[in-house]
Amino acid sequence: MRNKFLNEIVTKPTELGNKIKLMIRPPEIKVEEIEEDENTLSKTHQILKLKAIEGLKFDKTSLEAEAGKPIALIISNPDLLQHNFVLGNPDSMLKLGSAADSIITNPKAIEMNYVPEIDEIIASSKLLDPGTLEIIKLKPLKKGKYPYVCTFPGHWRIMQGYLTVK
């Protein structure tokens, strides 16, 4: 019986690979519901949505908004890891990244949600556990290209993008 099983492994590697993938793939994480009605929010704010996804990525590397109008940014985390969201002033990507790299040395980094205390930060989320979300309401922004990153240690180099305000 054992030899027959081993023979199947050798002769049908694709099937076995699929079986293994199914066995180790975690169940999908459902994101909590939004407490605030999105239709009501859209009457006063531009709605932008962003997800933290598998592979240390945001689902979008670029977002667009209209200058002079308030923004409601809905950040959700269906990933298995914790993530945050930090929005910086135009031309601040490298400074955000440098601050993200150095925050790990701060003994209060976890309490700070891994959000550095620098002037370039316009807005940030809390540290989002898997299956959670946060709505960040922004005052109207001027035209520009605003960088956003996840500042959880080691994430910012891959997990980044730009909000372009036109």
Per-range role (PLM):
Residues 75-77:
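Asparagine-centered strand-capping/turn motif at beta-strand->loop junctions
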Residues 41-70:
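N-terminal edge beta-strand
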Residues 22-38, 81, 110-112, 119-166:
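Extracellular/periplasmic metallocenter environments
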Residues 82-88:
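Short, hydrophobic/aromatic beta-strand segments
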Residues 50-52, 65, 87, 138-140, ...:
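Hydrophobic residues in beta-strands and at strand termini
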Residues 2-38, 43-44:
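Pro/Ala/Gly-rich low-complexity, hydrophilic intrinsically disordered segments
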Residues 88-118:
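The feature marks short-to-medium sequence segments in extracytoplasmic or secretory-pathway proteins
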Residues 73, 85, 150:
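Divalent metal-coordination and catalytic microenvironments
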